[in-house]
Amino acid sequence: MAAGTAVGAWVLVLSLWGAVVGAQNITARIGEPLVLKCKGAPKKPPQRLEWKLNTGRTEAWKVLSPQGGGPWDSVARVLPNGSLFLPAVGIQDEGIFRCQAMNRNGKETKSNYRVRVYQIPGKPEIVDSASELTAGVPNKVGTCVSEGSYPAGTLSWHLDGKPLVPNEKGVSVKEQTRRHPETGLFTLQSELMVTPARGGDPRPTFSCSFSPGLPRHRALRTAPIQPRVWEPVPLEEVQLVVEPEGGAVAPGGTVTLTCEVPAQPSPQIHWMKDGVPLPLPPSPVLILPEIGPQDQGTYSCVATHSSHGPQESRAVSISIIEPGEEGPTAGSVGGSGLGTLALALGILGGLGTAALLIGVILWQRRQRRGEERKAPENQEEEEERAELNQSEEPEAGESSTGGP
């Protein structure tokens, strides 16, 4: 009994496989009518034909005859010429359709169809799009949304017309697919995150496209977006340049302060004096004409960007040179400049003095060692001279006594 059941199951599987393999693929848009022709059937009654279908509406093969009638007529019915008519195909109509007909000469003809349905969604859109991105850190570009597709299809992102590959060069994509419980249509969402490179394109172009799950259907593309890319500027890159150098001028002179910020787009520049903001419009240049005592103090510039915190430069000191006085050597930025140079020269001078003292001490030690070595040599010479003198004195005495 079990063997017979297994054989029957295999026969059913093989019959279904044969139907699918030899079937003609038919694609129909959801909601539109579909007509399947029964090959070999007489165009007029009497007809000997039979339609069998296995779809989402049936648990097994459903048989339809030309006589028709019943609730199935609203779903599918046999036309007088033997064709099968579906007034409005839906997702449940996907499956296998087979027609077996015999002509008036008794020749049997079979027709096999594999029906697939589809629904093209509306044009996808990018929602929650960013107007500005920050270089060097992950940013959300936006979310691409496609609603009402069947099959689900896929969403893809593009940068300047070229496909973006997730998990490469700071690109990540978070996808979500939902299916409507009643219509069976799909809604796709794709969230794009990128890390723009420093020094890259300041206005990249992003777009998203929907590709249907069926061949021979063109992709649908969103309208492009062009967010700006802003590069955060480290504090040390906000430079304050003062003219004349040093910031010391005679009364009535002019001082020009320039705040240099190598960032795109350029941030707003505000000015501060002695830690208090100056009531001036944003400008990268501050000119102080006809310097007076009231203009003396410490100045700095603050670079402010819409999506970033303010960044302040180091301070520069502005002072007045009175007649007969020399300007301060340290009208420099944050105690640097000439003050730093003087400190470096002082350190080098100290090191040179120490080296000179060490050289003198070593020279004196060498002189002392040389004198200590010469002292014993002089003592030996004196002893030799004394011995010679003693030997010469007896000889002189003998020569004197032995005279005539």
From Swiss-Prot:
List modified residues, type Phosphoserine: S391
Stored CDD domains: Ig
Q: Which UniProt keywords apply?
A: Cell membrane, Cell projection, Disulfide bond, DNA damage, DNA repair, DNA replication, DNA-binding, Endosome, Glycoprotein, Immunoglobulin domain, Inflammatory response, Membrane, Nucleus, Phagocytosis, Phosphoprotein, Receptor, Repeat, RNA-binding, Secreted, Signal, Transmembrane, Transmembrane helix, Ubl conjugation
**Domain Ig-like V-type stretches:** 23-116
- Ig-like C2-type domain location is 124-221, 227-317
* Annotated TM spans: 343-363
**Predominant place of localization:** membrane
GO CC term, one of those recorded: cell junction
The disulfide bonds in this chain are: C38-C99, C144-C208
| Extracellular topological domain residue ranges | 23-342
Q: How is it modified after translation?
A: Phosphorylated on its cytoplasmic domain by PKCzeta/PRKCZ upon ligand binding. Phosphorylated by ATM following DNA damage.
GO MF terms here are: advanced glycation end-product receptor activity; amyloid-beta binding; DNA binding; histone binding; identical protein binding; laminin receptor activity; molecular adaptor activity; protein-containing complex binding
Q: What does the entry give for GO biological process?
A: astrocyte activation; cell surface receptor signaling pathway; cellular response to amyloid-beta; glucose mediated signaling pathway; induction of positive chemotaxis; inflammatory response; learning or memory; microglial cell activation
Please list the tissues where expression of this protein has been recorded.
Endothelial cells. Increased expression in pre-term labor and preeclampsia placentas compared to controls.
Signal peptide start and end residues:
1-22
Residues bearing glycans: N25, N81
Topological domain ranges for the Cytoplasmic compartment: 364-404
Assembly, per entry: Constitutive homodimer; disulfide-linked. Forms homooligomers. Interacts with S100A1 and APP. Interacts with S100B, S100A12 and S100A14. Interacts with TIRAP. Interacts with HMGB1. Interacts with LGP2; this interaction plays an important role in AGER-mediated pro-inflammatory responses and cytokine release. Interacts with double-strand break repair protein MRE11 which is a core component of the MRN complex. The interaction enhances MRE11 endonuclease activity and promotes DNA repair.
Reported function = Cell surface pattern recognition receptor that senses endogenous stress signals with a broad ligand repertoire including advanced glycation end products, S100 proteins, high-mobility group box 1 protein/HMGB1, amyloid beta/APP oligomers, nucleic acids, histones, phospholipids and glycosaminoglycans. Advanced glycosylation end products are nonenzymatically glycosylated proteins which accumulate in vascular tissue in aging and at an accelerated rate in diabetes.
Q: How is this protein named in the record? A: Advanced glycosylation end product-specific receptor
